[in-house]
Amino acid sequence: MKVYKFGGASVKNADGVRNLKHIIDGENELFVIVSAMGKTTNALEEVFDHYRTGNIEAAQAKIDEIAAYHQAIIDDLFGEHRTLGQVEALLSELQRFITTVPYDASRAEERYDRTVAFGELISTTIISEWLNFAGIANHWVDMRRTFVTQFRHKDANVFIEESTPLLRREVAGSAERVFVGQGFIGSAADGSTTTLGREGSDYSAAVVAHILDAESMTVWKDVDGILNADPKIFPEAEKIDALNYVDTIELAYSGAQIIHPKTIKPLQNKNIPLYVRPFGNKEAAGTRIDGNAEDVKIPIIILKRNQSLLTLRSRDLSFVLEEKFPIVFSILERFRIKTNLIHNSAVDLNLCTESSWRLEEAAAAGVKISLNIRGICCWVPGTVRGRASTRIVSIVDRYLEHARIFHFGNGGEPLVYIASADWMRRNLDRRVELM
């Protein structure tokens, strides 16, 4: 058995689906994991945001856009005016959920997972039907019935031991020897849909490979293999022919957009090689990852965006000692704030984290939040976004010493302004503003 994984970019249109068929032609004993098509997960996140804020009309309009996008792919593949009953049923189920199930802030992450999972369910349904139509008999697998996960939404881990008999039974009971399943999703013990984290389809494929004792796993991407830098930023980036498991884990953890960080462990445990190959060139070797490759000899450059620096200091200026670390990290774990870099001095503990503060989720859970903000705050207590348990004090004064920096998203074209500051370095160096 081989395992192939195709990301959303590789199946974003009908030509991509046809190319998937071209790649798997001639393969027997193959398990294909597929992500949502194109930017469907982003679109479903918009649906959820509208649902969360009570704008059901906007949510329905976005669902209509998603339906039209997939119908255009279906028309291109099968011929105009062809409908797929399973796809229509999934879209109707999504519509009913958004319009009839009231939003519950205490179950926000569960509702999020249930919403975004429709992307993978729809994409695999279309692809499975198309492969059957094109002469490749296959068995569609609902991964929610075969992956048992933690009761943890948005970033669950798969319980491999509990999932193994379920997936093996599904495979053994099928006459077809090509299987199509969803990446990114599973279910908790209570049957609720869970997701494995954004870009978690790599991890899904690795778990499948582990359970089925696959001879190899291949991720088909829009690059020639793993490069030593992002070619969109560094045009001179070079392809790496071979990597070992340890280097790959370190690169993924450090932010290299090559593979999901949780992918390697299930493969390493059974010494299953991983290939990263270009979906535009079936014959290209790409990059091989296994336990035998030598250390990489060329420099690797990783640019990680949207990072935040937290500086923690005790009020009495007591030393930062190791016994205080568990308190800090238990809070970070509680709200799933991922830490990428740690540095401590005598009285400060500095943490570099992903810019995902999760204040709304914490407030919705009843956590009392007190913010002292130097400047203007747009988070309003007592609204959908700002709960009554939140207390905000904004300090505005013409004689405040620090620089004030204002960042506006501006529809994807950010604008940054600096105000009320002179150009003395003390006003700019080592300042972290919370807006």
Residue ranges and their predicted role:
Residues N42, A189-D190, N228-A229, Y275-R277, ...:
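Short helix/loop capping segments that flank catalytic or ligand/cofactor-binding pockets
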Residues A362, V367-M435:
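PLD/PLD-like phosphodiesterase catalytic module centered on the HKD motif
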Residues M1-K2, E29-V32, Q71, A137-H139, ...:
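Structural motif
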Residues G8-A9, M37-G38, I185-G186, S201, ...:
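Short, glycine-/Ser/Thr-/acidic-enriched flexible segments
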Residues M1-I259, I264:
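Nucleotide/pyrophosphate-binding catalytic subdomain
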Residues N244-D290, D295-D316, L321:
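A conserved active-site cap/scaffold subdomain adjacent to cofactor or substrate pockets
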Residues R82-T83, I259-K262, P273-K282, F335-V347, ...:
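Flexible, glycine/charged-enriched surface loops at secondary-structure junctions
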Residues T287-S370, I376:
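A conserved regulatory-domain signal marking ACT and ACT-like small-molecule sensing domains
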